[in-house]
From Swiss-Prot:
This is Glutamine--fructose-6-phosphate aminotransferase [isomerizing]. Keywords: Aminotransferase, Cytoplasm, Glutamine amidotransferase, Repeat, Transferase. The gene is glmS. GO terms for biological process: carbohydrate metabolic process; fructose 6-phosphate metabolic process; protein N-linked glycosylation; UDP-N-acetylglucosamine metabolic process. Homodimer. It comes from the Bacteria. Its main location: cytoplasm. The keyword tRNA-binding does not apply. It is found in: Cytoplasm. Transmembrane segments: none annotated. InterPro entries: GATase_2_dom, GFAT, GFAT_N, GlmS/AgaS_SIS, GlmS/FrlB_SIS, Ntn_hydrolases_N, SIS_dom, SIS_dom_sf. Residues 2-219 form the Glutamine amidotransferase type-2 domain. It catalyses: D-fructose 6-phosphate + L-glutamine = D-glucosamine 6-phosphate + L-glutamate.
């Protein structure tokens, strides 16, 4: 959600800023802009609505060059997506700022600054920041010190970068609730909201922590913590190749990432399985001691990660015998929570920077939970740093806004957690762990077999091309998978989709079913299959068209208004992981047929770093 890039160097940095913004396009945005301090000491700005490519054209048509600059992609919160609301924002033509987050007291500050003679040209909360700093510079002329003073008056979340024409030797930044990372070079340094933006110029990074303020010069980086103490943050070298930011032979990042799932699941399992058991130490050196005390689990997440948590509830209770609650992070953080004794708090996030999930974790630390575990795809994220234990999903960078490989690796990680807890507590049935460990080893192969259904699913997608509504059904642990399928379809094809437990059809959803509303269901060959078949007959009796992803041994066949796609057999416990694949493919091909922007769907952002 929004992207920041900044640079201070001995060379022209305009192309670096634009390339950085391109690498942040996956986060979702509606406008883009940059500001550069030119050789004649003047701050110049270019802003455009739409894609970064349009900003690039504007810069080519009216070039600007300099060695200090900031750039931004905006996802509208305060103020419509217009060029006037796009960042950077100026004050006095000599101070420029870019900002991610939400300033909650912006109206109060706006009125105060208007009283001081400042004229506002946008509807954004960000413009308040730049005028406030401009005013502060009148009494505190050093840019870094002025920033330190000004942020004390800001309430809310922010990651911001600031430059001044009067102090051309530095870029300054502040972080509170919105991530920022410094990229370290030789005679040049950089800033971004995501290290992926800077991978073309460096592989060494320094992550700002909550409350940090940074002064970034060509040959020096200085950081102060929220108490005002000068601190040194760890330098991390990133070794993964840059091919993650390349679609390769695939038409879209989403399709590429769907097809990467066998390999990333294999990577997530490597080094975490013994001969016939899960290696508990994979969760951290204190995991065994902490897991032995666990009597309950509380899972908190958002979006796709929430669906992964819902699947895990079925596993934890049926396999490990541990009561589990799952809650949306934005709800958990604002309600009065009664914490059961010896409850493990589990947070799930692809980015590790999701604002509501982070806030829920921080709230949980005050509520008396036994300990915290983060299941996350980014090892240097805030969520990981602030949790007691961690299990990384190892999915690699995910560029498509609609999550695919992050979801399946989250599910794999949650199964590892289920088996580890059951192992330590002695609550698994005899032979279950060894059996499921063997099935996990076969899982990458099974996922590859599911991907071989690609052409079949592409053909079925034609049924949805002219539809406006779709119903997804599932039973047991497949209900959250149906929810994930519905989310994917609505995210990228813009078809309204809802998911229900199949047993709830008679309690309302059946009223919606007709020959213009396809019904999608997943049907593994388990004890609920016959119940599910009865539910599907109810759909057919009302003229509903069925698309059924069924186990190859389920005995289901095509018929009038019924399209059965056979799915490779897999152990029932792992079926939620496997059945995710065809639902992802279905959503993808429907979106392609409808001509939507698959990788960057409208109004959505990859990493939601504000409430």
């Amino acid at each position: 959600m929004c992207g920041i890039v900044g640079a201070v160097a001995e060379r022209n940095i305009t192309a670096i800023l634009i390339e950085g913004l391109k690498r942040l396009e996956y986060r979702g945005y509606d406008s883009a802009g940059l500001a550069v301090l030119t050789q004649n000491g003047e701050l110049q700005r270019r802003r455009r609505i739409g894609k970064v490519s349009e900003l690039e054209v504007a810069v080519a048509d009216d070039p600007l060059a300099g060695q200090l600059g900031i750039a931004h992609t905006r996802w509208a919160t305060h103020g419509a997506p217009t060029e006037g609301n796009a960042h950077p924002h100026f004050s006095g033509n000599d101070v420029a700022v870019v900002h991610n987050g939400i300033i909650e007291n912006h109206e109060e500050l706006r009125e105060e600054l208007k009283g001081l003679g400042y004229v506002f040209t946008s509807q954004t909360d960000t413009e308040v920041i730049v005028h406030l700093i401009h005013h502060t510079l009148k009494s505190i002329p050093d840019l870094t010190d002025a920033l330190k003073a000004a942020v004390k008056r800001l309430h809310g979340a922010y990651g911001l970068a600031l430059i001044s024409a009067k102090q051309p030797d530095r870029l300054v930044a502040a972080r509170s609730g919105s991530p920022l990372v410094i990229g370290l070079g030789l005679g040049e340094n950089f800033l971004a909201s995501d290290q992926l933006a800077l991978r073309q110029v460096t592989d060494r990074f320094m992550y700002l922590e909550e409350g940090d303020i940074a002064e970034i010069r060509r040959d020096q980086v200085s950081i102060w913590d929220q108490q005002g103490n000068k601190v040194q943050r760890e330098t991390v070298q990133y070794h993964e190749g840059a091919e993650a930011a390349d679609k390769g032979a695939y038409r879209h990042f989403m399709l590429k990432e769907i097809h990467e799932q066998p390999s990333v699941v294999q990577r997530t399992l490597e080094g975490r399985l013994g001969k016939d058991n899960v290696l508990v130490q994979a969760f951290g050196p204190q995991a065994a001691d902490l897991f032995a005390k666990v009597r309950n689990v509380q899972i908190v997440a958002c979006g796709t990660s929430y669906h992964a948590g819902m699947v895990a509830r079925y596993w934890l209770e049926s396999l490990a015998g541990i009561p589990c609650q799952v809650e949306v992070a934005s709800e958990f953080r604002y309600r009065k929570v009664v914490v059961q004794p010896d409850t493990l708090f589990v947070s799930i996030s692809q980015s590790g920077e999701t604002a509501d999930t982070l806030a829920a974790l921080r709230n949980a630390k005050e509520l008396g939970f036994l300990g915290s575990l983060a299941i996350c795809n980014v090892g240097i994220s805030s969520l990981v740093r602030e949790s007691d234990l961690t299990l990384l999903t190892l999915a690699g960078p995910e560029i498509g806004v609609a999550s695919t490989k992050a979801f399946t690796t989250q599910l794999v990680s949650l199964m590892l957690l289920t088996l580890a807890l059951g192992q330590v507590r002695g609550t698994l049935e005899a032979g279950v762990e060894a059996e499921l460990v063997e099935e996990l080893r076969r899982l990458p192969t099974r996922l590859g077999e599911a991907l071989a259904m690609d052409a079949t699913v592409e053909k079925i997608a034609e049924l949805f091309a002219d539809k406006h509504h779709t119903l997804f059904l599932g039973r047991g642990a497949q209900y959250p998978v149906a929810m994930e399928g519905a989310l994917k379809l609505k995210e990228i094809s813009y078809i309204h989709a809802e998911a229900y437990p199949a047993g709830e059809l008679k309690h309302g959803p059946l009223a919606l079913v007709d020959n213009d509303m396809p019904v999608v269901t997943v049907a593994p060959n388990n004890e609920l299959l016959e119940k599910l078949k009865s539910n599907l007959q109810e759909v057919r009796a009302r003229g509903g068209e069925l698309v059924v992803f069924a186990d190859e041994h389920a005995g289901m066949t095509n018929g009038e208004g019924t399209h059965v796609i056979k799915v490779p057999h897999i152990a029932d416990a792992l079926a939620p992981i496997l059945y995710t694949i065809p639902l992802q493919l279905l959503s993808y091909y429907v979106a392609v047929l409808k001509g939507t922007d698959v990788d960057q769907p409208r109004n959505l952002a990859k990493s939601v770093t504000v409430e």
